[in-house]
């Protein structure tokens, strides 16, 4: 009889569960639990078991924190590259428009010959790769909100390189977006609910997610085939809605492929699992569709409008998909849920300020001078009000005297 094998915290100890063991000769064995029995109440064994569990728990906590920090760094790097890619691609599209070539918003694909557009695409590819890796280390509810940083970077760079003005409202909106993202990071779940391809497959087979996927697919097809040809050039929400709806599938695919890569590093035969190829096909199709319609949105509308609205729609879809598929919200307390929602609504308010007042040319000096003028006018009006009040107070006294005098005569 060999030594006892203790499962780390979080691993289910139930019949039929398959686990991986590393043998002394550097080989790997797969074991299936066939019988589960209770341990005898031995004080020595109980103490030894508690000690081992505590060590494993501490090790698991350290590993979770390490993974969380790695995911945060990758997510921030992703936002920097993606935010820059919007500017580079827009710059390339503007250069093509100045040459009189058919624009992407009109169905043209001449941007494929513009090197600056390719630099932007490469920057977006690096950002998406970092984002891809971030989903393997941290929950989707934590990684996705950090995309608000791309809004900030895109807004700042567009004011410098595209001559798109960023007023005081836009700056306040950027700050609110960062604060909202920080709140969401603090209250986001810090443990992954799906850690293997088998669990991922079970989640994908859930009736709730299947219904969600069918509804999103039908809406996307209606927008692509019917609405986009008629309203795409005049309504910014059409192209962005397509990108956001399809983006929900891309994030789910990225999460699953990230889990597959982690299992591949652990020498598990994931290449034999058909789910890997299904996720890869969905990822390629969804990313291709996103790039196509995002190009049309950027070429047709202002970058400072496209970026924030795309962020709000995309984040909403990802959070919804994450809640349905990965069920990360089930492990959160009521306070964390309220904090996450508050942070997200703070981001939306910041995005609204960035978008709604973008054509309002107001500076900080104008705001301060206006406040001073209002204070002076308020003091003048208060003095006039006091003077009128004194006159009004004296008038009734005079009338009373006259009335009293007339009554005396009577």
Curated annotation (Swiss-Prot):
Chain segments annotated as transmembrane: 68-88, 115-135, 137-157, 166-186, 208-228, 234-254, 274-294, 305-325, 337-357
Protein role: Acts as a Mg(2+) transporter. Can also transport other divalent cations such as Fe(2+), Sr(2+), Ba(2+), Mn(2+), Cu(2+) and Co(2+) but to a much less extent than Mg(2+).
Organism name: Pongo abelii (Sumatran orangutan)
Protein name per Swiss-Prot or TrEMBL: Magnesium transporter NIPA3
GO molecular function: magnesium ion transmembrane transporter activity
Gene Ontology CC: Golgi apparatus; Golgi membrane
Alphabetical UniProt keywords: Glycoprotein, Golgi apparatus, Ion transport, Magnesium, Membrane, Transmembrane, Transmembrane helix, Transport
PANTHER family, A to Z: MAGNESIUM TRANSPORTER NIPA3, PTHR12570
Family affiliation: Belongs to the NIPA family.
Coiled coil: none
Residues bearing glycans: 25, 35, 50
Topology, Cytoplasmic side: 89-114, 158-165, 229-233, 295-304, 358-410
Subcellular location: Golgi apparatus membrane
Highest taxon of the lineage: Eukaryota
InterPro entries referenced in this protein's UniProt entry, alphabetically: Mg_trans_NIPA
Subcellular location, principal: Golgi
Membrane topology field: Multi-pass membrane protein
